[in-house]
Amino acid sequence: MNATLTRVNAIFNRDLALHLNLIANNAILIYTNASTDPYSPANIGASGTWNLELQRDLTSKIGNANYDIGHLFGATGGGGNAGCIGCVCQNPISSTDLAKGSGYTSPADGKPEGDTFDIDFVAHEMGHQLGANHTFSHEIEGTGVNVEPGGGSTIMAYAGVTDYNVQSHSDDYFAYA
């Protein structure tokens, strides 16, 4: 977690003048036994149930007033999901709301580490939580920021993921759109 946050912070600080800190009592949120953690198995959780499970875990254990953005680092499952776009600092209104604590990233290879994990996934999903939309142009989403050729090449693109790849992995910066 620390290595990933250090890598992501270098980019967020440079590009967004933003610095993220781990909360002091984060140890109560670290689970090392899948049979006792509050999350669905990867084959179910990575399909979207982790969003609400994380939001509920953060709300009950940390309290909404004690954090601004919550993001689950899974061990395996593949991909990620922000839960919402531009929801940083937004508390859930009900127990079924996806708000500031509903993002997750989980690698397909069981190795939540390195630039592919940190940049292509964590920074990308946190970018959504901070309000960023996709910048690739192989598919127009109607957000007005689809400015990069094909699958794109920056953090909010889908480098290496589409049939229209420009490159295999994201460059470590945000496109200006």
Task: Label each PLM-derived region with a short phrase.
Residues 1-177:
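Extracellular (secreted or membrane-anchored) zinc-dependent metallopeptidases
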